[in-house]
Amino acid sequence: MSAFLNLYRNTLSWPLSFLVKDNPIPNNPVEELTLNIEQPIVYVLPYTSQTDLVVLRKNCLSLGLPDPFLDNRIEGKVLPRYVFLDEGHQFFKSKGAKKETEKVFKNYLELHRTSADLDVQVVPVSVLWGRSPGREDKGLPKLRLLNGLQKTIAAIWFGRDTFVRFSQAMSMRYMVNEYGEDEKLAQKLPRIAKMHFAKQRISATGPRLPNRQAMFNKLLQHPAVLQAIEDEARGKNMTKEKARKEAEKILNEIAADTNYSSLRVADRLLGWLWNKLYQGIEVEHADRVRRLALEGHEIVYVPCHRSHIDYLLLSYVLYHQGLVPPHIAAGINLNFWPVGRIFRSWGAFFIRRTFKGNRLYSTLFREYLGELFHRGYSVEYFIEGGRSRTGRLLTPKTGMMSMTLQALQQGQTRPISIVPVYVGYEHVLEVDTYAKELRGAAKEKENAGLVLRVIKKLRNLGRGFVNFGEPITLSTYLNRHFPEWKNEGRDERPLWFNKAVDAVSRQVMVNINKAAAVNAMNLTGTALLSSRQRALSREQLLEQLESYQQYLLNVSYSDDIIIPSAPPKELLDHVLGLDRVGILIEKDNFGELVRLERNHAVLMTYYRNNIQHLLVLPSLVASIVLHHEAIQKDLVLTSVEKLYPFLKAELFMHLPPEALREKVERIIAELHRQQLIKLNENILSINRPRVRTLQLWSAGMREILQRYLITVAILLQDPAISRGKLEKESQSIAQRLSVLHGINSPEFFDKAVFSTFIASLKDNGYFDTSGNADVTKLQGMADILEHVISTEINLTIKSAVETAVDLDEIESE
């Protein structure tokens, strides 16, 4: 029998080797599932299938995992390295998979009772031939059990979409230690494995796709929708039937029309696109999401928004991580022919930019979103509302988050978890367009021709990054911060609600920044922009890159960030090898200079701003020490403590105030270790041989501190100034400063940044109850700021503020 079985397997191996692509999930099971390959492994498959076993073996060999065809040899006993839980459609009949498996498990368990060092790892594995969830009106897909003919067809049709899913290993040592005397333990192990397979199947395929019209009919019968239709008919003096047709038209505009075949085409197309544009996509912490999916959570992906391709990239990554691509909230501006129809088939549902005052639309959209949650579909939306033109996170728009919390409040049975996602690129497709818009050009309307023109002229754009941040399970978060949420009625909008929406939205942004991906472009751009001439010698640039890397490794911002491991020379060579970066190499008698072209300076600020929050605190410390030359450490700590609340609000930083002092101590220790500063008892001073590196570090805070001083100086001159006027004058002076001193950062005179700073001043007690500025507190901040800003900039700000105040006095006379 074994000879025939081996012949059969060898016969299967040849066609499967080219029909079926290796798609293991996760990509590195040894690391992600913490498998110990020094200990025996037993693979558990759900059904008897030699085809599945051959595909498993192919993947195991490519991953460096033990060969399932070879037996485990333990203390003189020979036991199989794989088992099947149930019978399948098979050519070679067995004595009964269930009994054989229980017997194998029993033998392994007995070995554990006699060998204290043994720990066999039981790894459930399923082979997914295609990932179609089926449709509500067409019954269940044949995912569970395929006969020989069906599997042949599956190998031909779905071979490139076959995934081998490895689950978390079960430790037999743990089972024996916990349940050693249980005679039925060998029977319990298969049952536990079956539970894994059931969860795997749901997390990989998701719920069945809806019958769109049936969903519309259900939504149109919802009491809230019926009331909105009635109000629409009454308010616009039309019949209820006409109002109902209008409601159905709106639903048709909103709703996705997901099609699995279309998703498969998208996978091929996007795979080609990433290979054309980028050198690879780095994905981190996807295990968090897989864990949530296996635990049955309703998952809401909330990525930062850099580019239109964010939609596509995240769905592509999730599909290849063994997860269901989500329903994506896309702006109505993307609903143009033919892209809108294509995106809709890939899971996009469309949302208008504003629907304030349109009760029928808002009700239908809210109920549609609630229905997606109720049916168990994962959802994705961009909380910033639009793409960031500056590379910084934008202030969150809370409408979608409000609807998400309403779904929880109205009795959503499954736990809802928000998954913040950091999406980063070494080159953003639209960055040239962003630069034009920031210089005042009108926003170009999206169309198919524009998209194709952008893609056609771009290639060799470096790497892309998708990093899944720390999830926020809403019920857990609300229990901790808003415990009263459970005591309110479902249909009410209680007092805690708006505060909770704002708090969760901000926490999402904080967690996105905690998952930042540092790359060669970020670091190189930060260093070059720190030089006033946007040029450095190659040696100085490499030294600065190494300093950044060492800091990020030794004083990590968070456990979630991605830090490049390549040496500085490789990072720089990588950036120089990319297209359209605007970095030139020039040679003189002293060696090579690396220079950033002037017209690319604004573009490079985009990439610097992606990681500015990671480097802002050491930049502040460096700036304080540099401008004082020698200063007491306690004064440095006090200065940082005064400025940190404003940095925290502006840059969505996560460090709580009570942990700040310890963090600054670590920063000082690292700067001292790098010999950038001297530390003599309680005195910090500059180390002159390394002063250039310290100057480049300090430049990372230069523009932020200048902005703060502009607003503080205006308030000191006119403590009773209105908030609107304060924002306007701050912006005007910043624009003047940027022209006079060649400041290229587009966010330098962004009104929203000044608005955030002014709101933070209010939150931190810099205004009295009458709305007037507290001059004494502001003067204390001004003293800090004036000491870390050059005399030239100080004089320009002072002169501009005095001129603005004089003009106001003339206008008021």
Curated annotation (Swiss-Prot):
InterPro entries linked: GPAT/DHAPAT, GPAT/DHAPAT_C, GPAT/DHAPAT_LPLAT, GPAT_PlsB, Plipid/glycerol_acylTrfase
Membrane topology summary: Peripheral membrane protein
Span of the annotated motif HXXXXD motif: 304-309
GO MF term list: glycerol-3-phosphate O-acyltransferase activity
Cysteine pairings via disulfide bonds: none
Pfam family name, one: GPAT_C
GO biological process per UniProt: CDP-diacylglycerol biosynthetic process; fatty acid metabolic process
Any one GO CC term of the record: plasma membrane
Pathway: Phospholipid metabolism; CDP-diacylglycerol biosynthesis; CDP-diacylglycerol from sn-glycerol 3-phosphate: step 1/3
Subcellular location: Cell inner membrane
Stored SMART domains: PlsC
Keyword list, A-Z: Acyltransferase, Cell inner membrane, Cell membrane, Lipid biosynthesis, Lipid metabolism, Membrane, Phospholipid biosynthesis, Phospholipid metabolism, Transferase
Ribonucleoprotein among keywords: no
Catalysed transformations (reactions): sn-glycerol 3-phosphate + an acyl-CoA = a 1-acyl-sn-glycero-3-phosphate + CoA
Keyword Membrane: yes
EC number per UniProt: 2.3.1.15
NCBIfam families, per database record: plsB, PRK04974.1
Family note: Belongs to the GPAT/DAPAT family.
Record's comment describing the protein's domains: The HXXXXD motif is essential for acyltransferase activity and may constitute the binding site for the phosphate moiety of the glycerol-3-phosphate.
Designated name of the protein: Glycerol-3-phosphate acyltransferase
The organism of origin for this protein: Actinobacillus succinogenes (strain ATCC 55618 / DSM 22257 / CCUG 43843 / 130Z)
